[in-house]
Amino acid sequence: MGVKIKLVLAVVLILSANVLGQDEIVNDTESTVSVTEAQVVELETDVKEKEDETFEETSPVELLPDTENLEVRSGKYQLNDGLVGEEPVNLEAVDFNSNNVESEKQLLSPPSTTVVTGTDYSYIDGRVLPATTYQNNGQPYVITTQRLQQIRSNFMYWFYDQGGSDNIGDYQRDIHTSTPQIHKNFNFQLPFFGFRFNYTRISMNGYIYFSDPPDHYTYPLSFPVRDWPNINDPSFIGIFFSKCRIGNMRPEEPDPRRPGIYFRLDRDLQTRTDQLGVEMRERVTWDIREGVIGSETFFPKHTITITWKNMSFAGGIDNSLFMTNTFQMVLATDEVFTYAIFNYLEINWSSHTEAGGDTTTGEGGIPAYIGFNAGNGTRSYEYKPYSQASVLRDLTGRGWANGFPGRHIFRIDENILMGTCNKDIDGANLPLMFAPESGNMLGGTIVNITGPCFNPNDRITCRFDTESVLGAVVDVNRAICVQPRFWHNGYARFEVAINNEPYKWKGRYFVETPATATEKIFFPDNSVHERYPPEVRITWDRFNLTTNLNVQLQISLWGYKEVTIRPQLEYIDMIEVGVANTGEYVINPQNFRNRENIMHNDMQFGFLQINLTTPEVFKGVPISPILWSRPIPLGWYFAPQWERLHGQRWSNSMCNNWLRTDRFLKNFAAQVWVCPCTLEHALLDKGRFMPDLDCDRDTNPTCRYHWGGIHCVRSGAPSSEGSGQQCCYDKNGFLMLSYDQMWGSKPSRSHDFGFTPYNEANKVPSLSRWFHDMIPFYQCCLWQEEQAVGCETFRFERRPSQDCVAYQSPGVAGIFGDPHIVTFDDLQYTFNGKGEYVLVRVDHSQLKLDVQGRFEQVPRNIHGAVNATHLTSVVAASNNSQTIEVRLRPQHAQWRYRLDVFANGKRVYFDRTALRVQYFPGVTVYQPMYVLNQSEIVVMFSSGAGLEVVENRGFMTARVYLPWTFMNQTRGLFGNWSLDVNDDFTRPDGTLASVDLNNFQSAHRDFAQHWQLTDREQRDIGVAMFVREYGRTAAYYNDNEFIPNFIREPANFLPVNRSHDVTRAIEICQDSYQCRYDYGMTLNRDMAEFTKNYLSSITNIKEQNARRVISCGILETPRFGRKSNFFFTPGTRVNFECNQDFILTGDKRRVCEDNGRWNLPDYGYTECLRQQEFSQRALFLTWGVIVAVILPLGLLICLLWFWCWHKPRSEGKEGFRFEDLPRSKSASRLNLRSSSMGNITDTMKSSTIPGSEKKSPETPTEETPARIVGRSVLAPPADGDSSGIGYPDSGKSDSGKSDKSSGLPKKRRAYDKTYRTNEPLPNAPDVEFPEKLWDLSEEDLLSLTSPSDSESNRDSTLTRPAKDIQYLNKPRQTGRQAIPSDSGYSTKEGSEDPYAPKFDDQYSPIPSQYSPTYSEIYSPPISPASDSSPRNTYNNPGIPEAPKSAPVDGIKTFTMPTNKGKQEYSSRTLGATWGIISAVMLPIIIILICVAWRILQRRKAEEREENEFLDVKTRAIDPDDSVKVTSDDESIPYKKDVTEETPEPTEGVQAVEPSNPNYNYGRPYVDLQPGQPRQWGGETEIN
């Protein structure tokens, strides 16, 4: 808001002269001049451009004065271009309330640029205190930029010596030598050095204080007072702490206001509308914002102005009263932050006489103390090098705050932070003031630096850890550097060097991870997480970049990947350039659809960046603030490119690529902690798990990645491999598993805090976790279906939840109250030692832990000192971790922070969101999100040990959590954790102390006191690790002479007259003796109640951890199915259901039993099958059963058929058993001579003589049917092996012996061809076979074997004739061509067979050298008396004569005799063959059936052709038809599969008519070579 000015006149400051000692105002009217018309036009134009730049209460406009043109004039600081004249300005000469422009013109000076309308500043800039009521006719006062510039050009703030109720203004006449201080109430809270006060005391001695000072001081002054509380330690702000007295004004003094102390209090500035209130508020606001870095948002509510004018030193002579100093202190606060402005106008002396100063000049001795002291023995800050040093006189020429030499600004609310440069200090570790104190790990944060004084041409180098960047000088008090990119989080060294100087200005800069950094770019909806969003809307705070809202911005996209050992964060694309700084923008993904980022399309997540289009340049260094978003997936940008690269299912392809890559990486699941089963256990495991900021029930209950969850916890430190664990819990408090749903708990390959050395792949904080764990979750699950294969692989294989079956709750021990201790084994006792002691000590080669406590005496009560102590500080360290100390703050310093935390000796704070969790080497420290006042701190070590410190109402408790790996390893006041209370009182030397628990003195003297610490290392005890401040060592706290109260009950140690206290203790505490003891000792109800509360808390924790949760573990959810519930505790009944169009198979229900196991399943599996797949499985199962039943049955039938069909009739139709088949003709002759006749006799006994049949062989009967000889192929034996069908063992065979003895070559018989069987040929002339003697009788055989046989008969050979035919005339060669073919055959009618028999009137005897058909002819041994020859065999008695001639109707077909030995061998061979065929063919048939079934489903259109094909294949072949099957015949179904699995025939197969002359029926394949395929032989075959 503002007043529109149409005509503005330039205001010239009127030169005024103030006469010393007079209160009259002399107006100098001679210096007034008029303003030219050109000047008025120019000023009017300038005002029109800035007519809206008026300051309001809530949004003051920043104005940067030209501080480079400031000069000093008689102690006043003025702008050269705004002020003229050598005399002080007197604005009271101008009546600004007259609204008379013409009169103003007469009073204005030509050079002035100040524009004022309708305002009288005489009340502000004069000596009279103005009224605080409304001015300017009751309208709210509005300050202009010109007026603000004018009032800020003055060095000293306003103070008045006139006006007010008593007409003394701000002057404090009650302060003088006899009463050097005065009390003032604020009626508001003034934070100072950790404390907060609503009052102060103003001292004439150059300071204000808030607590009683000591009775006397010793110089040089030292604070805090080491002997506190025996000696008072004052809390004060010392601008010039030295004994003073009010001096006299010198004649040349330009300021006529009287010497002394001035005090003015301006309250509620934020709501004031009067002129003084508004101008005071705006002046202080901009002086602090521009003077102190990091205070850009400060807005004061109250100010205090204290001025010491013309103060002389105490102890001087009368003339020393004119040796005076003038200085001013301005305190501004919003009741959270407090700033102090020290204005040193004039310093002429430095020390008073008690400090050794000269009585005349105040020089020499110890100069004044300048600094701050918190009081109560806590902290102090001495402003070096000026305090108590000779360079104190330089205070008027140093500081340069707001461009004024002599102005020094400090921030003093919690810590003392210097806001101005310090030119005169030097050292190796000078404190560096910088803001902000933390920044995003990605870089780009502008860091303002204050500490050294800068010259415009200085070269500034800032080093962040190991990275150095160049800075730029802004002014003498400030330089800026841009934070580079980090690859780690936590605290980093921050150092500044000027020119060629070493890095001596040092500080610590906190690096925030991208996932936990303060969010600066916001996404109002979830569109950025989608694959194809229509738009992506972003917002940001427009004032985070610059206060100039007209500046142009640019938005860019960055991506991250890990394809090499080094992480890569790279620029991808510019989203938009020239964006207005409106705080919002909408991204249209369609604009980037045709982009081709070939080098970056493998980046799957990244960040949005917003910065200035045109960076500002300071000393050649471009400076532009940068805003980063949180990590976001880049599907909205790269989806079209990924679709072109991977297809429409790009998410599935990318998921598969990740799965393939992740399988090559090392498994990490065994390295992380096991999740607790319930949320209660997870919240009580302080050493291993901490809240997950992405799903926290207190601050972030949305749980984007864990829908249905209410709270998640994460492992507090990375594992030995750098991985982390996550455990999420549902509304019932049970662990959510990824086997049940994709929102379940998931471990991570990379921990969010990273892993040393951080700058390598898989070890970068936040970024590596997003790369390895978060983006795969998007690709496999969020961008696909939950039951997709990739998502289930992600959930079940790559990132599966660990069940809680093996979880073990930690052991807990604690200390609280006065103090009372509960050990790990639940032993309770009280120990009131005073000093520093060991609580827990573990000294193992792999596990090391030290937890120490400090006990200090309880504050006094109304009856005096209290002989009891309480816990005030705890320090802990583990292995190689940093040391963490948590200290109780003083009672009056707990208004903002209840506990102080020291990390490696430095204070750290958790007051901002990004600082809630801080990671240090080996240890993580965090403040729970629901805590805002730092009253609860949790320390987590990488070993799993945890320390929890809680404060309430000034009373502190500490609890230690240890995993089971520490069992039997602990020592100290918390005992030996062995589940046995008897060894808890173990001394450092390992001996057990005998302690009476009812006697506090016994535990104190015999056990606890042995664990006291000192500042030197002690064996089995260690060394004290506490932060030492102001020389307070362990000896300062240890008090072995302190004797506490050892009596347990208040009724026994309180005096009789305090029986009401005893009664009160019983009412408050009831059955808790710890509570009664604390109340009886301290009479503090808060302490007693919190003692009872802490005891209940640790008792409940122990009971909860001791409560074992029995878990049945993981029960997988079937794919395409669901479970009725996700519980896993005993008694849980889980029913399985399937999605629509799916059928459940297997177990439908499982029950968790009391033994922690799921009941035994009926089937062992549970599946949800599609209806089609279920039908296929049912069909396959049916076919499997059929095949399993039919195949053995068919095999059995085949075997039975073989036995029944080939076995001769039992009525005497069996042939001789030719057991030995010689290899050659010569061998046959040898066998005839050497075979035993006894063998023939045995054979004949087992044979049926055809001649003995009742029926005449002349006429065929049903018992002797005409049939073709079956297949009877004999395989030749292997070399050296004569065992086989017809071949006796080589070692036993007579033929073998004969062959060997005869010396004849052994001709290898081959049976792979077809042999003539002399079967009747079709259409051949009928031949009447003569009657023949079918075989020898048994008597004849017996006669042949009689001893009367002569030796000569050995040369004769007895043949075993064939059953149905006699061979006449020439003997027939046996051998390869004598083997019968595989099928019956006949010669063509009229063909001549040279081997065909000639039917004569009589039979011719068979020559002995010939072997008919099988050549199975034996030579039985013939007795020497026998002289019969083979030719006379059939003429022997008892043998019927052969018929004279054959019958007229001769037998056209005949049957070959079977051989029983051959039949047994053939049966075995056939059985083995069928077994092999079945074993091979059965799986092939099943596979072919499966393949055929699936092909049938895919190619239903070919079902008709398949049926036709099957019909053709099974019907008889028409001789007139010719079927040709080639590889190009498309009538064959499933041609594709056939060609893939079996080779196609090279030529067709034809059906040929038997009458065809080319049809070689009945003839052997004499022209075929081994291995050559034979022609088709009467059946339809497909080769």
Swiss-Prot record:
Q: Which residues form the VWFD domain?
A: 811-1019
- What membrane topology is given? Multi-pass membrane protein
Query: What processes does the entry annotate via GO biological process terms?
Result: cell-matrix adhesion
Under the heading SUPFAM superfamilies, the entry gives: Complement control module/SCR domain (SSF57535), E set domains (SSF81296)
Chain ranges sitting on the Extracellular side read 22-1182, 1494-1583
Q: Which UniProt keywords apply?
A: Cell junction, Cell membrane, Disulfide bond, Membrane, Phosphoprotein, Signal, Sushi, Transmembrane, Transmembrane helix
- What positions does the domain NIDO occupy? 260-415
What tissues contain this protein?
Answer: In fifth instar larvae, expressed in midgut epithelial cells (at protein level).
| Gene Ontology CC terms | lateral plasma membrane; septate junction
The disulfide bridges present are: 1112-1152, 1138-1168
Q: Where does the record place the AMOP domain? A: 647-798
Q: Does the keyword Phosphoprotein apply?
A: yes
Q: Return the Pfam families for the record.
A: AMOP (PF03782), C8-3_MUC4 (PF23263), NIDO (PF06119), Sushi (PF00084), VWD (PF00094)
* Function recorded in the entry: May be required for the proper organization of smooth septate junctions and for the barrier function of the midgut epithelium.
Q: What is this protein called?
A: Protein mesh
